[in-house]
């Protein structure tokens, strides 16, 4: 039987949604802040005009030129076939350019928001839930549920300090996961992270020159991880 929106609302009024409200409120009470290392690096990368994994191209692809000197209605059978291929390729590039334009607007807006708020100590999000109970932040650009670079721009405003090897293990495992090393045991992931301390420190020192983080499945979250992993291991080594 098909239900109307009002039927659904009437049904919800009979339910105990206390736990759902608690979940939403817990999310809304969680403070965030901007990761300055990531936003500064992202701005430099985006403005460089170079190709970076996880970012759209800065410029549109060139559309192919009409390959014949006569109008389509005068083409022979072989030329007509080539013309159809030309139109198909042109349409694909045109569609790709339109999508890229939308992505460029999104990333520029996201960077601008991050730069606007990077000096603010704590940020909070307004959250909503849908009919399935899934929770989403209302903000559509700079969001912990958005693109890889958007997630990397955010960190908890009340971070937990790593105090022992067991806690460090989970930071190591996170690093392996964002690099795509997630089909091996947790122990192997931890080992992988320690084997790549030097790479992480190199990224920490100069992320534009040392592009190891660009090899990751989630490159911008990998960049954020390199920063944290380098800080942790530098502190462990030098105190």
PLM features: what roles do these ranges have?
Residues 1-239:
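Non-catalytic nucleic-acid-binding interfaces of large nucleic-acid enzymes and RNP effectors
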């Amino acid at each position: 039987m098909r239900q109307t929106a009002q039927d659904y609302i009437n049904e919800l009024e009979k339910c105990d949604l206390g736990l759902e409200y608690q979940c939403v409120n817990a999310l809304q009470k969680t403070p965030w802040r901007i990761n300055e290392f990531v936003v500064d690096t992202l701005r430099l990368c985006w403005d460089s005009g170079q190709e970076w994994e996880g970012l759209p191209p800065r410029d549109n692809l060139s559309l192919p030129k009409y390959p014949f000197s006569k109008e389509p209605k005068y083409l022979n059978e072989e030329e007509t076939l080539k013309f159809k291929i030309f139109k198909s390729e042109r349409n694909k590039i045109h569609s790709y350019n339109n999508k890229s334009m939308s992505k460029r607007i999104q990333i520029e807006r996201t960077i601008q928001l991050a730069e606007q708020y990077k000096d603010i100590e704590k940020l909070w999000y307004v959250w909503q839930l849908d009919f399935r109970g899934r929770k989403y932040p209302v903000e559509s650009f700079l969001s912990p549920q958005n693109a890889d670079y958007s997630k990397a721009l955010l960190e908890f405003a009340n971070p937990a300090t790593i105090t022992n090897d067991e806690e460090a293990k989970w930071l190591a495992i996170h690093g392996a996961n964002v690099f795509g090393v997630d089909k091996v045991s947790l122990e192997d992931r931890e080992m992988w992270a320690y084997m790549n301390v030097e790479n992480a420190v190199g990224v920490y020192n100069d992320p534009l020159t040392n592009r190891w983080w660009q090899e990751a499945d989630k490159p911008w979250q990998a960049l954020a991880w390199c920063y944290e992993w380098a800080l942790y291991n530098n502190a462990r080594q030098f105190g």
